[in-house]
Structures are given as structure tokens and as C-alpha cells.
Regions:
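Glycan-processing catalytic domains of CAZymes
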Residues: 1-259
Length: 259
């Protein structure tokens, strides 16, 4: 079972990255920068030397926003449309070739994407790109964190988002969803719905995403501890757990250190 924290990449918070890299509780990281950037290359090298793992974000390798409006998490309707970039296959091939040539390919656990359906990616385009990644890198994992709309629209949805299907999610190996409200019975239900909509595949690794931030400005230490412990207890019930990937979007590093 892995443990990681979003938004702790070298190019975002170098001090926090090295603290976690040199510690003994974080063993997986997420890189959202360009793989060719110096910071991203240094991050991959350092992770490899420590024997830890990295997921690399692939959203902008293949997709681009046509329009993007208000964010849901500040209380307004989210509206987006995303299309495939021209020449996206060549871009994906170039990124993979760079990572392979780095000498640190072994440290790349796989590829990551965040809330693709809420962001406006169609089910067809999602399947197309993940299938291409699987074809090019059959030994690597493909990890997706869905919005609630993408897996349990009866709990929450927006902008006519079409939830995931077994066909569209066929090439995924690791999945999660993110919700940062008080931990309660809905989390088990949403997890069950996510698995059901993906065909109840036994090979899928299931992750949980604990809230370790002052989400919407009204979360405190107790909220975060309850959320973390709840996610962990839920994850321990899984036959094929992936791990915990804590989210720190608003508060890393100062308030996270305080927590």
C-alpha cells in the first residue's frame, strides 16, 4: 500500500519535496510539470536513487481546453470542453522516449490524470488516449482520480458530465475519487459505485484521497485527522488497495506542517 501527497513536486515546493523524499512515510510522488524541465528531471533522478516511485501527469500531453469557466469548489457551476491536441500521439511518444532515455524509467510507476470527465474530456477521447498509453507502455500503470460526477452522479454532478463506463475505463489500473467533506457513510457508497461503473474489476487498485488541507477555509486539524483515518479504514477493506494520496492544494506547506 502506497502513501503520497499531492502538490509536493520539486518544482512547486522543493524543501517539502526533499523532506518527504528523505523521510520514511511517503513512497510515491506525482509530477505535474513538463518532463523535460530541469526540476522534473532532477525530481525523477532523486526518486529513483531513493528507490521510490513517480506518477507523471499526462493531461496536457494529449488534451487541451477549448473553454473553461467557474470552478465548482468555490460554489459555481463548472463548464469545460476538452479536445485532443493535433499531433498528440507524437507528443506522447516524445515524452515517453525522454523518460526512457533518462536512465530512471524504472522509477516511473505510471501515468496520472485528474478529474478528466469533469474537465470536459469525452468518454471516447479518454479511452483513446489511455489505450495508446497502454499500447506504448504495457509495463506501466494508469492512475485516474475521478470527480464525484464521474463515478456517483446521484451524489453530486455538474454540467451534464457523463460518468465513467467499463469501456472508457478499460485501460485504467488505479482509480480514486476526491471529496473533502466530513467523512461518513457516503465514502463507502461512492467507492462501491466507482468500482461498479468500472465493471467491478478485481485487477483495479483502489486509492483513497484524504483531505489534508483547509478546504474552502472551514476545515481544521480534527476534520483532517478524521478524514485521513476514515479513508485508511475504508482502504483496508479493499482486496486490492493502491494507497492513500493526500490532497494539500490550499495549504502546503505551512499549514500542512502545522497539522
Amino acid at each position: 500500500m502506497h502513501f503520497g501527497i499531492f502538490h509536493t513536486a520539486l518544482n512547486i515546493y522543493p524543501d517539502v519535496f526533499y523532506e518527504m523524499l528523505n523521510g520514511d512515510f511517503v513512497d510515491v510522488f506525482l509530477s505535474e510539470g513538463e518532463v523535460e524541465d530541469q526540476a522534473s528531471a532532477e525530481m525523477l533522478k532523486a526518486i529513483h536513487e531513493k528507490g521510490k516511485k513517480l506518477y507523471v501527469s499526462f493531461f496536457f500531453w494529449a488534451y487541451k481546453h477549448v473553454y473553461r469557466e467557474m470552478m465548482v469548489d468555490v460554489g459555481s457551476e463548472y463548464s469545460a470542453r476538452v479536445v485532443l491536441r493535433d499531433g498528440w500521439q507524437e507528443t506522447v511518444d516524445a515524452k515517453i522516449a525522454f523518460l526512457r532515455a533518462s536512465g530512471h524509467w524504472e522509477a516511473v510507476e505510471g501515468f496520472y490524470i485528474d478529474e478528466p470527465l469533469l474537465n470536459g474530456i469525452t468518454l471516447e477521447d479518454f479511452r483513446t488516449v489511455t489505450a495508446y498509453l497502454r499500447e506504448r507502455c504495457p509495463d506501466k500503470r494508469i492512475f485516474c482520480c475521478f470527480s464525484i460526477a464521474g463515478v456517483a452522479p446521484d451524489v453530486w454532478t455538474a454540467n451534464n458530465v457523463k460518468p465513467i463506463t467499463p469501456e472508457a475505463g478499460q485501460y485504467l489500473t488505479d482509480v480514486a475519487f476526491d471529496m473533502y467533506h466530513k467523512f461518513d457513510e457516503k465514502y463507502a457508497y461512492i467507492t462501491s459505485e466507482m468500482k461498479r461503473r468500472l465493471g467491478n474489476r478485481e485487477d483495479l487498485r483502489i486509492w483513497q484521497v484524504p483531505c489534508t488541507m483547509n478546504y474552502r477555509g472551514d476545515k481544521d486539524e480534527q476534520h483532517c485527522l478524521d478524514h485521513l483515518n476514515g479513508c485508511y479504514e475504508l482502504l483496508k477493506k479493499e482486496k486490492n488497495p493502491g494507497g492513500l494520496m493526500c490532497c494539500t492544494f490550499y495549504t502546503c506547506p505551512a499549514e500542512v506542517e502545522a497539522l
